[in-house]
Regions:
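Charged linear interaction tracts used for macromolecular binding and regulation
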Residues: 80-105, 110-113, 117
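Structural motif
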Residues: 46-61, 70-72, 106-115, 156-168
Length: 173
């Protein structure tokens, strides 16, 4: 799907209609084919401050305010979650989940944890990083699993080829 955007407008075609949405300070816009949504990044000097999530019909599904550490969405009413020391967030309307990777402080040497919320705003799971590693970001979401990129916190956790990163597969069922 082709997405066109300028500093103040994002447009795309869906089901024979042209969808036009005005937003301030657009940095980038993209179609996420796995979620079947349009994601728009807004901010200043190429630094994102707000990420907007739209349905293909142009309906605002949710938005993430990066400086404030919040995500807001509408699902059977308005919801908001405030995150402290958030490192990575994935908003997944397709699987009706919000996945957040966070740390207990701003120290990047500490292992991160994953929290999973449903769209009612209820925390449904919390998972620690594998021993000796920290979770960096979610690379893939499916109905059955998450694929998370992890990084070693210490040299003794590197593999025999000297790699510090690996994929951690987390079963969701």
């Amino acid at each position: 799907m082709r997405i066109d955007y300028s500093e103040q407008m994002v447009t795309w075609e869906w089901d024979g209609c042209v969808i036009k949405i005005e937003l301030p300070d657009i940095i980038h816009a993209e179609y996420n084919k796995n979620e079947n949504i349009v994601i728009v990044y807004s901010g200043e000097n190429f630094v994102s401050k707000i990420i907007f999530y739209f349905s293909l019909e142009g309906k605002l599904l949710g938005q993430q305010n990066l400086p404030e550490g919040t995500v807001d969405w509408n699902h059977n009413g308005q919801h908001q979650i405030v995150f402290h020391h958030l490192h990575h967030l994935r908003f997944s309307p397709k699987y009706q989940r919000i996945f957040s990777i966070f740390r207990s402080s701003s120290d990047f040497g500490l292992p991160s944890e994953l929290e999973i919320y449903n769209l009612e705003g209820e925390k449904i799971d919390q998972i620690e990083s594998p021993a000796g590693f920290t979770m960096l970001y979610i690379s893939e979401i499916s109905k059955k699993k998450l694929r998370i990129v992890c990084e070693a916190l210490k040299d003794d956790c590197f593999d025999k080829s000297g790699r510090s990163d690996f994929y951690f597969n987390l079963d969701l069922e």
